[in-house]
A protein has these predicted regions:
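N-terminal chloroplast transit peptides
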Residues: 1-17
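Conserved short alpha-helical segments that host acidic/polar catalytic motifs at enzyme active sites
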Residues: 2, 19-361
Length: 361
């Protein structure tokens, strides 16, 4: 079996990880990398899903590696909630969202700004060096245009030796991006809004090239980071070597085991998404997306002003129902200057037997 080494963790890493990560070379036909067209009984517009979710958190917001490890145990125990095809080692998707592991990142990237003054994100790239370089150049251009500062790119260390043929064939190159705001001028909510704009603007330019359809930003935020992929729940911990490090600590962890049913599995459709993860089906998806598109012309944001128009459309046919829900939630959070619980309550209001609900309710 052929392997090649990629993705060192840096001079401060453990000896095993500093040698890089094991990555197999795929021999599966390239046709397995693409979403299938409408054919026979398959129609992407009729896709549905049902998944498993779980969360571990410290009520005192104290980060620890135990929370991350316990979340992995929870994820593995939800294997029955996930799915796979004829290959038991090619999953429908699984992942984990944690707080930004500041101590871990400082060990491998000395000189980071203070916590909350930099954002971190994991990005999927087409698996060839030329495409990776092109995507990075586009991101760096938008970083400069938004007045942000590039801290570092880091090849994410992974071990793909346990992946099945289908997952392996569609496996992306994965890079971690560290971005800071203007020194002393941007942090917290304002910086997260700019990171959201950066992700949307750069992603739109990258994906305008049909050859870049595998490009995807898992997350880009000052407070959370997402590790996910077309994996089984059992594969997440072994695939992402970062998660195994004792100083990878978090005050919370959100995990998701995906059951695709009719939804075609992919690395990007795995969850958690950037703001949330979702279990179930949105049966009114097409109507929801149509109504969202119809409202875009009248959207106004005091926080973004005229720049909001450059971030549209919000929803996409490439995303699952959960992915579109996540995108609209982010719009309400960043452009609407709302907290996440407010955004979710607006999108899924509580049941009420009368025609109108009192504003104070």
């Amino acid at each position: 079996m052929l392997r090649r080494l990629v993705g060192p963790l840096g001079s401060g890493a453990t000896s095993a990880l500093s040698r890089g990560s094991l990555r197999r070379v795929s021999t599966t036909p390239a046709s397995l990398k693409r979403f299938p067209p409408k054919q026979g009984l398959y129609d992407a517009a009729l896709e549905k899903d049902s998944c498993g979710v779980g969360m571990v958190a410290s009520l005192k917001a104290e980060p620890s590696h135990k929370i991350v490890a316990d979340a992995n145990t929870m994820l593995v125990r939800m294997s029955h909630r996930g799915g796979c095809g004829s290959e038991p080692n090619s999953g429908d998707g699984a992942g984990i969202l944690t707080g930004v592991p500041d101590a871990f990142l400082r060990r491998i990237q000395p000189g980071l700004p203070a916590a909350g003054e930099y954002g971190v994100g994991n990005l999927f790239f087409p698996n060839n060096p030329e495409a990776v370089a092109k995507c990075k150049a586009i991101f760096e251009k938008h970083i400069d245009e938004l007045g942000l500062q590039l801290v570092a790119w880091r090849t994410l260390p992974v071990d793909n030796s346990a992946l099945g043929p289908t997952s392996l064939e569609s496996e992306p190159a994965i890079e971690q991006l560290l971005v800071a705001g203007r020194p002393g001028a941007m942090s917290g909510r304002e910086l997260n809004r700019e990171l959201w704009r950066l992700r949307i603007l750069a992603s739109a330019e990258v994906r305008a090239d049909a050859a870049m359809e595998d490009f995807y930003v898992c997350s880009l935020h000052t407070g959370t980071v997402v590790y996910k992929g077309q994996l089984t729940p059992e594969q997440v911990w072994g695939y992402f070597l970062d998660l195994q490090q004792p100083d990878y600590m978090s005050h919370l962890a959100l995990v998701h085991s995906r059951f695709s049913t009719n939804t075609f599995p992919s690395w990007s459709r795995a969850q958690p998404f950037r703001a949330l993860c979702h279990n179930g089906e949105i049966n009114t998806l097409r109507g929801n997306k149509n109504q969202m598109r119809s409202r875009e012309a009248s959207l106004v944001s005091a926080a973004l002003g005229d720049s909001l128009a450059n971030l549209l459309p919000i929803t996409s046919n490439d995303m699952s129902d959960s992915g579109n829900f996540d995108a609209v939630a982010e719009l309400l959070i960043h452009a609407g200057d709302r907290q996440i619980h407010e955004a979710v309550m607006m999108m899924v209001p509580e049941a009420w037997q009368n025609k109108d609900m009192p504003p104070d309710r």
